[in-house]
Amino acid sequence: MEVLKLCLLLTRKKQFEVELIPEKIGARRPWKLETSSTATEAVVSVVTYLEATSGNARDAKEAGIYIRVYGAGWMIPEFVRMLMLHYSKHGECILQEIGAAFRGEHATDLLLICDGKETVRAHKLVLAAASPLIRMILEETPVLDGVTTVYFPEVQVSYFRLLLDFLYSGQVYVRSVEEYHHLQDLLALLQIKASIWKNSDGSDAGEPRKSEPLVDINRNTEGITGSSVVHQHPSRRRRSKSQDSLSGDSASGGGGTGSQAGTPKKVSVKSERHSAGSSVDGDGDRDREENLEYLDEVEEAIIKSNNNHPLHPHQHHLVAGSGGHHLHHHHHHHHRQLHQISRHDGDDDAGGGSGNDGASEGGSGESGRAGSVAGESAGDRPTPTNLSSGGGGAGSGRRSGSGEPTEPAEDDEDYELDVEDRGGDGDEAAGEGETRSRRSDPSANRRRSSSDPVNLSIVKQQQDVDSDDANIDVETIGTATTKTLLPPRYLDPFRTKRKAAAYYIHPADAEALKPMDHEGLLHNSPDNYVVTPHRKRRPGFHNSPAQNPPFVPSYLDDLRARSKCFLSAPPTYLPEKYLSVLTRWNLKTHLRVHTGEKPFACRLCVAMFKQKAHLLKHLCSVHRNIINAPEAGGRYTCCFCSLVFETLQELVRHLSGHHNNLLLSKNLHE
């Protein structure tokens, strides 16, 4: 007789389909027997079929196609194969449904009345499964209607809600050890087994360990069945790579004048990130994190937009050739400046808080830092130096209320000297006494009047060895040497960190290379700038050149005197065709620090900026409610036209290209 195999399939309609397939292919056609009743009838049908085909039931039994389902029939294991239907996420789905029913109070059949007649609704099945006391009450109490009421007159409703959260979700956060002890007493009252919420070694979970103040509710150890209660909410903070670097910068050198690094700063993106990173309070922390993520997105979009559509296209070409090293150096510092676009060039106290200057960072209260070395790359100095002094000697004093102490340097290479002008006639003792009074009285540090122009120059005299570089005032700058005022990299523009071999060039290329003319570039700049203090609000001030001669730094003579390189070989210079474009643009941008010129203006407020990237960052952060309104559905809307963009980078590229004229302050009244 042919050996037949039986396949029993369970469908959603609970019907059994029996398929008999001969072992030998082609010996007999498959037979399908269907039934909509029970498995017993299916077995009977199979037996009937086998008796009809083989002649008796004994041969059918020997063939091994009898099965037994819930006691109906026989089963021979070596011939019968059972199929199993596995529900992979059964427990997870059940917990989700039970939790949703508890939160929405759906199909609740248990009413708990606590102290103060406050009620809590729950489900009998969940509480009876965990609490023997609730199970006993439900078994002994006749159910008159669908809802059973249980009174707990001495239990506060807040503790019962914590207990229900623990029973429904398997974990709960408590605010203090006292709450934990109350919850522990409630668990004991309901006769809930200690193995559910205690460790197996019998240690008291209510006493937190000093080395482990946070206990995870889902932590499983050896011999533990269940979970433990957490007594303190863990603080979760996410800090991006840019946030870590910014917080490090602000902690190292971003402090206010005459104070420690922990002093609160003026309004700036850096200080906001640093303060938001240390906040751990609920919804406020989440809002700050969302704002920080948005600001990171804005900064990244502006950087990508500048990389795709650079303000200076020539910088993408000036990498190869004999001057490639120096060009890479300029490009590196220009890229570092793009990362510093959090320093706004607006005003500290502009209306609506929208005109925040990056120069106001550090807590000094001034509208901006002025000064640096002419011809220095603008990207090489993210925090320019302000050197302002008169023609007086070392013993000359300064005007009352016109100066501020020096801020500490942000890095090892950048010296930030913020010293105002001083009168030509004065006594040395009076100047020292006034300086001491200014150090003792912080309220005397006020912003210098913007109506008096200032000539910037560098005073080079002898300085004592014991002078403190971190607290340079009028007296110390009057006696300071050139080495203290200017780092060596200013006096030697060809100093690099490469090997000495980089300074040697082929003799055939010496004729094509030519040193740059610093003085010629300065006097032949597009505008003969007049050096004045930083201005407020809108530009438009003009001073007479006779009253204010152009800024000519005195270190140019030292540059000419030190023209010879420290090596015997001639120094390597950039070709003039590169310097004529690259250096002049950097010089023009840098001179805005001294002149106070802000060619970029915001049309939505009174803020003005020295660079376009600062204005774009201002539009995307301060006026976020306009470009990223809630009704826009997460998309970005142009504030000058009705175009809508999917990403922030597309909007920044659109503003920088199509509406470039609207960003200029000279077209403000058009």
UniProtKB/Swiss-Prot annotation:
Function description: Transcription factor required for terminalia development. Negative regulator of the JAK/STAT pathway: represses JAK/STAT-dependent expression of ventral veins lacking (vvl) in the posterior spiracles.
InterPro entries: BTB/POZ_dom, Dev/Hematopoietic_TF, SKP1/BTB/POZ_sf, Znf_C2H2_sf, Znf_C2H2_type
Domain BTB: 108-176
Molecular functions per Gene Ontology: DNA binding; DNA-binding transcription factor activity; RNA polymerase II cis-regulatory region sequence-specific DNA binding; zinc ion binding
Any one cellular-component term (Gene Ontology): nucleus
Protein name: Transcription factor Ken 2
CDD domains (alphabetical): BTB_POZ_BAB-like
Disulfide bonds: none
Any single biological process term in GO: regulation of transcription by RNA polymerase II
Sequence ranges of Basic residues compositional bias: 325-338
Bias type Gly residues, positions: 351-368, 389-400
Subcellular location: Nucleus
Pfam family, one: BTB
Zinc finger (C2H2-type): 586-594, 600-623, 636-658
Source lineage: Eukaryota, Metazoa, Ecdysozoa, Arthropoda, Hexapoda
Region (Disordered): 200-288, 307-470
Gene3D superfamilies to which the protein is assigned, alphabetical: Classic Zinc Finger, Potassium Channel Kv1.1, Chain A
Feature: compositional bias, Acidic residues: 407-419
